[in-house]
């Protein structure tokens, strides 16, 4: 039997029809080791005659081998003589569009040549070899795919159950290419179609093209050829539109190892999908792709070196641009997720840094946020002063100033040099503990004064009113700042100068007042107030109506501005929960605790172990409620 090597690509003029090579090359692949003879179910996809015009003519595989074949000394496959069984004695016609200048008689022969039919009484009809093909006549039908317009012509229907197998021509490419691994566990072969290169594609109303048969690296059929199997498989990796065709569920042991091909990017998306119209591959999220590294929310792309959501990106950018300083009300290990990311800005910013967000990438110059555009022309002095400022501007400026003032008054470094959680913490005389108590109160007064000067509008008040407000609220500010900074759950108290002391070290000086401060701190931290609410709480504890003010009206206006900024912060949805009622309730509790503080100072004065500083003595007398 002669060795035949058929190539399908554009052929030079004068060559025989069987030796022509077409632009679309054929390749096969053993998709599963359990298959030897595969039957193609082509009825589900309804491939029209136009979609199969690039297939080789049946005359290529007719029984007569005469002179239309070129004999090659070395062939890839040695096939048996194919037998083509045609229903009703008529084979479907194949119309191939020649894209090169071929002889006219070749084109005429392609449209009218009929394959030879073997005798019906031959024994080969009962058991067809593996290289035989069975064609069944089927009427034209309307294609389900809108990309393929309906055309009249013979259609391939499904293969009969009695047919042992249906194969496509094997990959007889020259020169051969290197075989690559196969797709493990694949259930469906992929048929790829691509536009014919010589003629521009004519798009259909649904966006389809005149397509040619082009199986690529992921599209192939199994070709069991018995003992004369090939040692490698070749494929032409071309971009194409995939349309899956199912294989018949007929299995038999293989006589040779399967041929492997490179998996197509769309192979995974076609498994389990409808073979007629596979959907495009979806983005895989198994490796965490598409989630924010900070809070776990949806994230489209990377920001500042890490895949983050828009909320965490904006939070990180604002924090770096404004050089904001945050304070954690808990143990600096607050959970940061989609639901609780706004509760603690300190822990959120620390997590941004821990996941790898780079502060140096944030633009802090005059072009920040403009995405590379040139700065606009400077406005004239008349244009820079708006005739009527927008209402939200003053509250927003007030809120930013309050937060900045609170963070600036927070100690940068903590001093653990005197921290002692053991029983030796109570060492020392009572006078030393009382003196320590007075020193801590005195240091808080200086911090409160520098903090108050950064509040917008406070320095516009009369000097007498400024002094009165600071001195009247010094105990409230002392308790509030101590409650915000301290980790009272572990009995660690952080004072305004950064000194960290254990509860046992403060108990002899503070007395029972220390337990009241601890309870207030735990309740305040349970409210989950953000830094904006804490800043407003600190300001409202000082700027309020006091007896002896010279201009109480101006103090009331400043208090209303702070309250408006808090309401504006809550109305814009920036606060996680309603905060105004919580802030007002915390103010009431703060006043009660300050009364206990006055009682403690009064008791120490009566004890007279240590003379109080003059500033403490004056403040005590001025803040008495009688």
UniProtKB/Swiss-Prot annotation:
Residues 289-364 bind DNA. It is linked to Ewing sarcoma: A highly malignant, metastatic, primitive small round cell tumor of bone and soft tissue that affects children and adolescents. It belongs to the Ewing sarcoma family of tumors, a group of morphologically heterogeneous neoplasms that share the same cytogenetic features. They are considered neural tumors derived from cells of the neural crest. Ewing sarcoma represents the less differentiated form of the tumors. A chromosomal aberration involving NR4A3 is a cause of a form of extraskeletal myxoid chondrosarcomas (EMC). Translocation t(9;17)(q22;q11) with TAF2N. The keyword Disulfide bond does not apply. Residues 92-152, 192-211, 265-284, 364-394 are annotated as: Disordered. This is Nuclear receptor subfamily 4 group A member 3. Residues 1-108 are annotated as: Activation function (AF)-1 domain. The keyword Transcription regulation applies. It is found in: Nucleus. Keywords: Chromosomal rearrangement, DNA-binding, Metal-binding, Nucleus, Proto-oncogene, Receptor, Transcription, Transcription regulation, Zinc, Zinc-finger. Residues 394-623 form the NR LBD domain. Induction: Induced by inflammatory stimuli in endothelial cells through an NF-kappa-B-dependent transactivation of the NR4A3 Promoter. Transcriptional activator that binds to regulatory elements in promoter regions in a cell- and response element (target)-specific manner. Induces gene expression by binding as monomers to the NR4A1 response element (NBRE) 5'-AAAAGGTCA-3' site and as homodimers to the Nur response element (NurRE) site in the promoter of their regulated target genes. Plays a role in the regulation of proliferation, survival and differentiation of many different cell types and also in metabolism and inflammation. GO terms for cellular component: chromatin; nucleoplasm; nucleus; transcription regulator complex. PANTHER family: NUCLEAR HORMONE RECEPTOR (PTHR24085), NUCLEAR RECEPTOR SUBFAMILY 4 GROUP A MEMBER 3 (PTHR24085:SF2). A zinc finger (NR C4-type) spans 292-312, 328-352. SMART domains: HOLI (SM00430), ZnF_C4 (SM00399).
